[in-house]
């Protein structure tokens, strides 16, 4: 399951790169894959370094601190005793942080970050329902989901 989640995230990350127009007849510019670019100038290089060293770790620590992972842990073991709190879209903070860290890993190797992402993906994968559905605000307490979730799956798609 973890491999499926990783493959899905990587596919989503790589799709925009594959969708770019390739250089060819009448098109003077050939796109470069972002994994082939090394930004080292003093302006953007420093910002990418700050993202890697400060922003990504801070974002993951905020996910821990604010209970984002707890929602997934509860969804992995649903119970009517769980009171669904917070915002129904809190899960996206976890997904976007994984996405940002994954982009960073494409250009800067970091074994500790890979291990940490794997540990988060373990938590996320355990929260998925057997058919792959995942919405912690509904899954952690299916009989009493978050008020914005609707009475059944897909009932509030708008």
Model-derived segments and their meaning:
Residues 20-158:
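Glycan-recognition and catalytic cores of secretory/periplasmic carbohydrate-active enzymes
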Residues 9-18:
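Hydrophobic h-region of N-terminal signal peptides that target proteins for export
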């Amino acid at each position: 399951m973890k491999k499926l989640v990783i493959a899905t995230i990587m596919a989503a990350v790589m799709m925009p790169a594959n969708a770019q127009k390739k250089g060819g007849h009448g098109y003077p510019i050939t796109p470069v894959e972002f994994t082939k670019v090394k930004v080292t100038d003093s302006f953007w290089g420093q910002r990418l370094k700050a993202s890697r060293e400060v922003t990504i770790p801070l974002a993951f620590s905020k996910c821990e601190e604010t209970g984002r992972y707890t929602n997934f842990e509860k969804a992995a073991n649903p119970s009517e005793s769980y009171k669904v709190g917070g915002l129904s879209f809190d899960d996206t903070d976890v997904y976007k942080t994984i996405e940002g860290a994954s982009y960073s890993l494409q250009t800067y190797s970091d074994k500790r970050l890979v291990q940490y992402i794997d540990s988060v993906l373990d938590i996320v994968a355990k929260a998925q329902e057997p058919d792959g559905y995942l919405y912690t605000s509904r899954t952690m307490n299916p009989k009493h989901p978050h008020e914005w979730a609707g009475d059944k799956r897909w009932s509030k798609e708008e």
